[in-house]
């Protein structure tokens, strides 16, 4: 099986924070683009700006921990002031270290059973 760790994070946007959200997205995308172990990082907003989903994909648990460290150091406080998590689904077989971080964010885990990525 693959070592890839990915997730889909569903969020509600705090009232009055949409401008802050757009600025934060730009900063986080640029910072994450520099992480060599990040395979995919996409943000999506509803038309009214009230709902946000983030799709993230990392080469392995080590790359995931690099991202989580950067997130915690640079963005976590502002992120949590802009969003309320409403769902967090993690895919793959993350390490115990990764699970230790993601458990605190309310993650649910789904293990791989088949399929492929091109």
Question: Locations of the language-model features?
Answer:
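An amphipathic, aromatic/His-enriched active-site/gating alpha helix that lines ligand/cofactor pockets
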Residues: 33-39, 48, 57-113
């Amino acid at each position: 099986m693959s070592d890839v760790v990915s997730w889909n994070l569903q969020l509600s946007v705090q009232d009055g924070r949409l401008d802050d959200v757009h600025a934060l997205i730009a900063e986080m995308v640029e910072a994450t683009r520099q992480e060599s172990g990040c395979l995919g990082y996409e943000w999506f907003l509803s038309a009214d700006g009230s709902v946000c989903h983030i799709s993230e994909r990392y080469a392995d648990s080590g790359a995931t921990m690099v991202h989580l460290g950067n997130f915690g150091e640079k963005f976590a406080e502002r992120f949590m002031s802009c969003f309320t998590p409403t769902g967090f689904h993690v895919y793959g077989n993350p390490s115990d270290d990764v699970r230790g971080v993601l458990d605190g964010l309310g993650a649910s885990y789904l293990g791989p059973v088949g399929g492929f990525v091109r």
